[in-house]
From Swiss-Prot:
Keywords: Endoplasmic reticulum, Fatty acid metabolism, Heme, Iron, Lipid metabolism, Membrane, Metal-binding, Microsome, Monooxygenase, Oxidoreductase, Transmembrane, Transmembrane helix. Signal peptide: none annotated. This is Cytochrome P450 4F8. It is found in: Endoplasmic reticulum membrane; Microsome membrane. GO terms for cellular component: endoplasmic reticulum membrane. It is a single-pass membrane protein. InterPro entries: Cyt_P450, Cyt_P450_CS, Cyt_P450_E_grp-I, Cyt_P450_sf, Cytochrome_P450_Monoox. The chain crosses the membrane at residues 15-37. Belongs to the cytochrome P450 family. The keyword Endoplasmic reticulum applies.
């Protein structure tokens, strides 16, 4: 039998065996992987030295806990962006760098690159996959481009025009509830809670043509949507739950699975019922019936969509897009509306000017209803809304993973394999872009002032090829609801100052409380 000489180790010769050889090969492979990873880690670290970084807690924790999802964390972030206006690196532990980009000129290089170079396939987005599937938010590559082309017509102004009446009716229901509460002596409201229900009510009508009356009574579907949103936030704050197989063994994971199934069943039922109607009536008669009702909902548009080769969206694709729109459309709009009411409550002179603008627009009109063409006739209200979206952006941040090196305008390079945090809150609070960024000043958005700024200085709906496809829908809804609210109520601050908390959207810890006074 052949012998394997280990004399150089000071050991006597032993008989060679397949197991020993396998052990040596395995150990060599593992050592090679460790050496390769170590080299790549240090090489990446050297390349990142061109980006400044705050002082670490220590070598092991890095910057963990520096910017927390709390009011204090946002204040720290504001200080960091004043110190590092171009951006900075944060280390989450000893081995995970995150490149935080805070300046429009730097952000442009990342946002405007192809999605093949900067993708969204990173940890946070994966936690949404069981709920949202491969909708526009999560899909990448050819599938994303194909769906984006097919969905763009769904947000054409001819489709959006009839939704104005839906926005108004949902706002009317919310306002009637506020009037009742005021008569009962309850003038202090958590406006975020009320507006979230109102936006969910509108979305259900716009997407499914379904009225659940969720503002007046509990709705199983709406409750499931709100539970899923809360569970996603909770999951992303607990690192050990990132793996699906671990998460779905937990009580929260099982609740998530049940809520997902309920939401999917509802969407599937609507799609199947609508497809049966379309098949039995034929496209022409179906469209004729829709023309009489003057509303083509989101499901209708998706069912009728086809590419140049005649390929339609599958039922699974339609469900993913409908669920994505429900997820992306309710809390973001609720956040934007809640914070603009807060800012106008703190600045009564701007609130009164907005109110006078709406009153002047509708003075000869009964009933007092907003129409599509009116939205362009509210310039000061629009300025106030945009300034609030700057100061309190609904989506505080989003991330991109770099699959290739990205060269910045100043010749620095973001190395392949790193995650970039496009920090909308930091960009909007950057003193090198916005003088006195903590001051609420609607005149920043006077058209003359706006022309002087980079288009990347104000990106509440993201920017570039993957910007929010529903931003016109969201802006229209916010303008309608804000105008009608100011027409009917005076908004006053509460003694409780809100503590901002950046979750998926920018919320207020323990609610955003304001006082509402009905106007005569």
């Amino acid at each position: 039998m052949s012998l394997l000489s280990l004399s150089w180790l000071g050991l006597r010769p032993v008989a060679a065996s397949p197991w020993l050889l396998l052990l040596v090969v395995g150990a060599s492979w593992l050592l090679a992987r460790i050496l390769a990873w170590t080299y790549a880690f240090y090489h990446n670290g050297r390349r990142l030295r061109c980006f400044p970084q705050p002082r670490k807690q220590n070598w092991f924790l890095g910057h963990l806990g520096l910017v927390t999802p709390t009011e204090e964390g946002l204040r720290v972030l504001t200080q960091l962006v004043a110190t590092y206006p171009q951006g900075f690196v944060r280390w989450l532990g000893p081995i995970t760098p995150i490149i935080n980009l805070c300046h429009p000129d730097i952000v442009r290089s990342v946002i405007n690159t192809s999605d093949a170079i900067t993708d969204k396939d990173i940890v946070f987005y994966k936690t949404l996959k069981p709920w949202l599937g491969d909708g526009l938010l999560l899909s990448v590559g050819d599938k994303w481009r194909h769906h984006r082309r097919l969905l763009t017509p769904a947000f054409h102004f001819n489709i959006l025009k009839p939704y104005i009446k839906i926005f108004s009716k949902s706002a009317n229901i919310m306002h009637a509830k506020w009037q009742r509460l005021a008569m009962e002596g309850s003038t202090c409201l958590d406006v975020f809670e009320h507006i979230s229900l109102m936006t969910l009510d509108s979305l259900q009508k716009c997407i499914f043509s379904f009225d659940s009356n969720c503002q007046e009574k509990p709705s199983e579907y709406i409750t499931a949507i709100m539970e899923l949103s809360a569970l996603v936030v909770k999951r992303n704050n607990q690192f050990f739950r990132y793996k699906d197989f671990l998460y779905f063994l937990t009580p929260c994971g099982r609740r998530f699975h049940r809520a997902c199934r309920l939401v999917h069943d509802f969407t599937d039922a609507v799609i199947q019922e609508r497809r049966r109607t379309l098949t039995s009536q034929g496209v022409d008669d179906f469209l004729q019936a829709k023309a009489k009702s003057k509303t083509l909902d989101f499901i209708d548009v998706l069912l009728l969509s086809e590419d140049k080769n005649g390929k339609e969206l599958s039922d699974e694709d339609i469900r993913a897009e409908a669920d994505t729109f429900m997820f992306g459309g309710h809390d973001t709009t609720a956040s934007g509306l809640s914070w603009v009411l807060y800012n106008l409550a703190r600045h009564p002179e701007y609130q009164e000017r907005c109110r006078q603008e709406v009153q002047e627009l509708l003075k000869d009109r009964e009933p007092k209803e907003i129409e599509w063409d009116d939205l362009a006739q509210l310039p000061f209200l629009t300025m106030c809304l945009k300034e609030s979206l700057r100061l309190h952006p609904p989506i505080p941040t989003f991330a991109r993973g770099c699959t290739q090196d990205v060269v910045l305008p100043d010749s620095r390079v973001i190395p392949k394999g790193n995650v970039c945090n496009i920090n909308i809150f930091a960009i909007h609070h950057n003193p090198s872009v916005w003088p006195d960024p903590e001051v609420y000043d609607p005149f920043r958005f006077d058209p003359e002032n706006a022309q002087k700024r980079s288009p990347m200085a104000f990106i509440p709906f993201s920017a570039g090829p993957r910007n929010c496809i529903g931003q016109k829908f969201a802006m229209a809804e916010m303008k309608v609801v804000l105008a009608l609210t100011l027409l009917r109520f005076r908004i006053l601050p509460d003694h409780r100052e809100p503590r901002r908390t950046p979750e998926i959207v920018l919320r207020a810890e323990d609610g955003l409380w304001l006082r509402v006074e009905p106007l005569g």
